[in-house]
Amino acid sequence: MTDNGTKDCKPASAKRYWWKAAASFLTVLFTMPLGHALMIIMEHAMNETALHYSAFAMGAAGMIMVIAGVYAKGDTRQTLWGFFGGLLFWTGWVEFLFMYYANRYGTQPQLDPVTGEIVTRPEYLIMPASFGFWMMVMLMYIFSTKNGCNFINWWQRRILRNRKNEIAARPMTRHTSIVTFMELIMILWGSYLLLMFCYDDNFLGDHHPVTLLVGLGCLIGSFFIFAKQLRIASWGANIRMAIATVVVFWTPVEIMGRMNLFNEIWIAPMEHKTEMGIVVAAFAALVIYLCAAARKKKKAVH
């Protein structure tokens, strides 16, 4: 998904950076439930008009943060700008916009036939319609960019074969903030598409063996990605790798939640204030630490 360059993803040595990998992983991981909780709180706290304006402003703020990251100094700072800007962009201009048009044109949620509870919200039911746009971006990355993304490189080796260096000869202009932003958006988007196609009874269904295998495969895959992340010395590159680790890891979490194997506290944050408060506090502490680490690194360079 990125044009990181191989230097970001390739381990510099056999040394393992447990604290950097754990801190990066947890920082990204905490954004998953917090993002869900934020959407639900906004829906309950705002009227419809205020919600739509706030969501659009959120997406705009995210875009501004990503652009600001282009001008920021330091790899870690640029990564953080791209990451947090990307989260606001995705929530405001993707998820909330899908919600707006799903509600405006009367898309009905998918209900549990036994309990009558909502199992899939309308905005996610229509999201698979964007598959063609996702593939359009992927075609550009596979055929037109030389980059350090293992997923894209895997496809390039199989599609382009011995002409890989000829067809995908050059990387894009590299801005770390944009790299992080695009990585986050494409991986989140791809994971939602994968889950929605798996949940669709016309394709598989949420209890289909293939859906369970997808969850198991992603769980196992996340450990392999984390093993690579452990060997990355740079904070910025470690955080970027953590995005892939977390989103792949979160896929089986979503599947298990869909099967009611555990209680998803983030879909009812007001009923789990203590637990969500702990997550917010831990997340804030990690973000402050990462910002301090970025500032310290910048001073060391100067």
Mark where each language-model region is:
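Loop-to-helix transition at the N-terminal end of transmembrane alpha-helices
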Residues: 46-62, 80, 206-214
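Short, hydrophobic transmembrane alpha-helix segments
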Residues: 38-50, 69-75, 199-202
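Hydrophobic alpha-helical transmembrane segments in multi-pass integral membrane proteins
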Residues: 248-266
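Small-residue-rich transmembrane alpha-helices that serve as helix-helix interface/gating elements
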Residues: 215-216, 268-288
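Membrane-interface helix-loop-helix junctions at boundaries between adjacent transmembrane segments
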Residues: 72-169
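N-terminal signal-anchor module of multipass membrane proteins
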Residues: 2-49
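Long, contiguous internal "core" modules enriched in hydrophobic/ aromatic residues
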Residues: 121-126, 138-237
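Central hydrophobic cores of alpha-helical transmembrane segments in multi-pass inner-membrane proteins
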Residues: 32-36, 57-71
